[in-house]
Regions:
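Metal- or metallocofactor-binding catalytic centers and their adjacent structured scaffolds
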Residues: 1-48
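Shared catalytic-loop signature of beta/alpha-barrel
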Residues: 5, 12, 155, 166-183, ...
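Predominant activation on well-ordered alpha-helical scaffold segments within soluble catalytic domains
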Residues: 14, 34, 38, 42-43, ...
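Conserved, mostly hydrophobic/aromatic
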Residues: 37, 50, 94, 129, ...
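Glycine-rich, aromatic-flanked loop segments that form ligand/cofactor-binding clefts
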Residues: 38-76
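Proline-centered loop/turn at the N-terminus of a beta-strand
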Residues: 52, 66, 125, 181, ...
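Metal-dependent enolase-superfamily TIM-barrel catalytic cores that perform enediolate-based chemistry
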Residues: 64-173, 177-178
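C-terminal extensions of enzymes
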Residues: 273-315
Length: 315
């Protein structure tokens, strides 16, 4: 399906792959695989034309974006050092996810959030990811609504993955009634799966993952469909430097984007590229104008984490 194809027509080639893998099932691992191919084709397209992907998508609305440091929650008595390390790195926004939250009772949940707010202070944005896509997630709408009310008291920016990832009707009710923005959809694949969530306003913030949905070709279409329905695009990015570089190009090309996810600490983000991503004094990330994704490999870092020796063709 790929041999002999053009390497500078990512949208058409990716759509061909979606169409011709129909019998293997649309979505899931097949779409994850296509995502990697699509991102690579966009990088090639950018390098051939000597343009950043964001410009090839239609233009750049910004040159910097606020990253939120994304980290796993811990019990309140041991959590502060992890939060302090993120603040020390320069993050002005932090998302806390999974860990014990939602798994050991409401008192534990509030103690974690109270500790986090007291640790980072009033000027750092806090986001909460309950991890409702975790296996056997036990909670439904009533828990999510009451938890959202608690989070509002601590000035949490958004509440993510409060319900199981396929609970469309629950999310519609929660988004309508919660006192703070609701975010979800990181596990969905292909733009067709996102349409009911956007068109029925099931979330305030939509979170496609470029390494899962079909790559840049699909995610840009999802982001602009959300924009047309006044839903904020916040890309999910719990992956590698390639995912972050792709997300940065996307948020540059979407009019209302405000944040990008940045795992912290993140050896698979920081160690495998020649020029690591760095936050400026305002806590923002610059969005590269170099061709393609705007990154080059650090072959030593790739070898250290994967055992692979990069050849010239890999670079």
């Amino acid at each position: 399906m790929l041999i002999g194809e053009s390497a500078i027509e990512p949208v058409r080639v990716s759509e061909k792959l979606h169409q011709t893998t129909f019998w293997q099932g649309r979505g899931g691992a097949v779409t994850h695989f296509i995502s990697g191919i699509d991102i690579a084709l966009w990088d090639i397209f950018g390098k051939v034309t000597k343009q950043p992907i964001s410009r090839l998508l239609g233009g750049r609305y910004r040159d910097r974006i606020k990253p939120y440091g994304s980290l796993i929650m811990q019990e309140p008595e041991i959590f502060p050092p992890r939060l302090e390390a993120a603040v020390e790195r320069g993050f002005k926004a932090i998302k806390m996810g999974w860990g014990p939250f939602g798994r050991f009772g409401d008192k534990m949940d509030e103690a974690i959030i109270r500790t986090a707010r007291e640790t980072v202070g009033a000027d750092v944005e806090l986001m909460v990811d309950a991890g409702g896509s975790d296996r056997y997630w036990p909670h439904g709408y009533k828990w999510a609504l009451e938890t959202a009310k608690m989070l509002k008291q601590y000035d949490v920016v958004w509440f993510e993955e409060a319900l199981r990832p396929d609970d469309l009707q629950g999310y519609i009710k929660l988004t309508e009634n919660a006192p703070l923005p609701i975010a979800s959809c990181e596990v969905l694949t292909r733009r067709q799966a996102f349409m009911p969530w956007i068109e029925q306003r099931a979330v305030d913030y939509i979170q496609p993952d470029v390494t899962k949905v079909g790559g840049l070709s699909e995610e840009y279409r999802i982001a602009m469909h959300a924009y047309d329905h006044s839903i904020l695009f916040v890309p999910h990015g719990w992956n590698t430097a390639v995912g972050l570089a792709a997300d940065l190009q996307l948020v540059a090309a979407v009019p209302t984007a405000r944040w990008v996810e940045y795992i912290t600490p993140a050896p698979y983000v920081e160690d495998i590229v020649a020029e690591p991503f760095t936050l400026d004094e305002d806590g923002l990330l610059s969005i590269s104008e170099a061709p393609g994704l705007g990154i080059e490999w650090n072959s030593d870092g790739v070898k250290a984490h994967s055992g692979m020796e990069l050849t010239r063709s890999d670079l």
